[in-house]
Amino acid sequence: MLMPKRVKYRKPFSAPRIKGVAKRGATVSFGEYGLKALEPKWVTARQIEAARIVISRYAKKKGKMWTRVFPDKAITKHPAETRMGKGKGAPDHWVAVVKPGHILFEVEGLDLDTTKRAMRMASDKLPIKTKLVSRR
C-alpha cells in the first residue's frame, strides 16, 4: 500500500473543500496515454493500488505504466465504540487529494484498444469520473 515514509505532522488539518482545477500534473508527461480526473475527490491508497494492479495486468511486459498520484494526506479516525471528544483520533488511512484535470495514470507501449480496456477497468476501481487522454 502506498504511504509516505515520514511526515512532518502525523495528524494534518483537514481542508474544507477541494477548490479549482489542477495546475500541476495536468498533462501527459511520461507515457503516450493518460487517465485524467474529471471531478474533485479524495482517492484512497487502496483505490490507487487496485487501479494500478488492473493496468499492470493489461500492460504485462510489453508496456510501461506510471502512477502520477501519491496518497500523502493522513485521515484520522476514532476507534469503534469510543465516546466523542478526547482529542483527534489516530491516523487510519492515507488519501491523495485529486483535483479535476489531474493525470492519475500513464501508459505507453500498448495499442489503443488494450489501453482503452485497461483504463476503463482502472476507472471502475476509482470513485471519480475519468477520461482517456493522449499526448498528441
Curated annotation (Swiss-Prot):
InterPro entries referenced in this protein's UniProt entry, alphabetically: Ribosomal_uL16, Ribosomal_uL16_bact-type, Ribosomal_uL16_CS, Ribosomal_uL16_dom, Ribosomal_uL16_sf
GO terms assigned for molecular function: rRNA binding; structural constituent of ribosome; tRNA binding
Highest taxon above the source species: Bacteria
SUPFAM superfamilies in the record: Ribosomal protein L16p/L10e
UniProt keyword terms in alphabetical order: Ribonucleoprotein, Ribosomal protein, RNA-binding, rRNA-binding, tRNA-binding
The keyword Ribonucleoprotein appears for this protein: yes
Disulfide-bonded cysteines: none
A Pfam short name: Ribosomal_L16
BP GO terms, sorted: translation
GO cellular component: cytosolic large ribosomal subunit
Primary role: Binds 23S rRNA and is also seen to make contacts with the A and possibly P site tRNAs.
UniProt family annotation: Belongs to the universal ribosomal protein uL16 family.
Xref: PANTHER family: 50S/60S RIBOSOMAL PROTEIN L16, LARGE RIBOSOMAL SUBUNIT PROTEIN UL16M
HAMAP family, per the entry: Ribosomal_uL16 (MF_01342)
Subunit-structure text: Part of the 50S ribosomal subunit.
Listed NCBIfam families: rplP_bact
The protein's name: Large ribosomal subunit protein uL16
Gene it is expressed from: rplP
